[in-house]
Amino acid sequence: DFECPFCQRHFAQTWPEIKRNYVDTGKVRYVFLDFPLEQIHFKARKAAEAAHCAAEQGKFWEMHDILFAQNGNLDVGQYVNYAKKLGLEAFAFDLCLGSGKQSAKINRNVASGTSIGINATPSFIIARSERGDIVSGGNIITGAQPYRDCYNSLLLQAQKLITRFLATDDSPC
């Protein structure tokens, strides 16, 4: 939720360490799913649509970063300017944003989260996966938790479990 202050805090304080220590090293795969809390964050859905419109031109993460950098002060009138700043084709971006065609994707993301018990932002799942589907167990973390106190220990624990699994004869590989 690009309008959520706790999501913004996670993005600014916790995400850089997770990215540096786990994602960039290939130890984990990070999947971002939209979960705009529209009943309290009225601008969050359109911001999510803007990120997906940028994704059509290969710039999801760059738009993601710009939107979170706004600290909740989202202005749909600025989205085309952000797109231009990223070097996107502005007409195509604006057409995408005005069409609402990304709405179905956002609805699927929300339904997916809701189906596994997500009801707040930010929320994270640390689990073993296969082809993007959650395969076994997992921990749901809700709220902007500190990296050192929460994520690092859970990610290390998950990494040890996966290493142990791959070393046994039970491995499907």
Task: Describe the residue ranges of each PLM region.
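C-terminal cap of thioredoxin/glutaredoxin-like
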Residues: 11-15, 20, 81-173
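Structural alpha/beta surface segment adjacent to cysteine/selenocysteine redox centers
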Residues: 2-84, 89, 156, 164-173
